């Protein structure tokens, strides 16, 4: 997927992100204030996500950890800060600490994230997310 900036070139915050009027199925990630459009996943990608979600769900049943497939916002900072500049949506997110789970997604580092890679992923895109 080519990187696409949303709206005009500027730095965005979580507050901005929450106020965007997005069309159905439109998704973005904020990484250090830069907004990147996310393309719709293909059928193979979705099949892998579904299979892994089912396996993790079964494994985690009865444990404090919960599995969340995308779209599920992950903010790496725990504090309630509307000025956060990074919000990502990993393909799968596991969160064990109940205090990190909220109606708006995960606040703080999750216990596990899974990204399904595809041939369309660029090296720059993968490095950008890995460095988080």
Regions found by a protein language model. Give the residues of each.
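Gly/Pro/Ser/Thr-rich low-complexity, intrinsically disordered segments predominantly at protein N-termini
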Residues: 1-132
């Amino acid at each position: 997927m080519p990187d696409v900036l949303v709206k005009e070139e500027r730095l965005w915050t979580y507050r901005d992100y929450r106020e965007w009027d997005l069309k159905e199925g439109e998704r973005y990630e904020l990484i250090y204030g830069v907004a990147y459009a996310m393309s719709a996943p293909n059928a193979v990608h979705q099949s892998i996500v579904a299979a892994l979600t089912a396996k993790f769900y079964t494994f985690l049943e009865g444990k404090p950890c919960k599995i969340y497939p995308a779209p599920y916002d992950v903010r790496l900072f725990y504090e309630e800060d509307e000025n956060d500049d990074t919000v990502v949506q990993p393909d799968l997110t596991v969160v064990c600490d109940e205090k990190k789970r909220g109606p708006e997604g995960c606040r703080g580092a999750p216990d596990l994230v899974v990204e399904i890679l595809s041939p369309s992923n660029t090296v720059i895109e993968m490095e950008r997310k890995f460095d988080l």
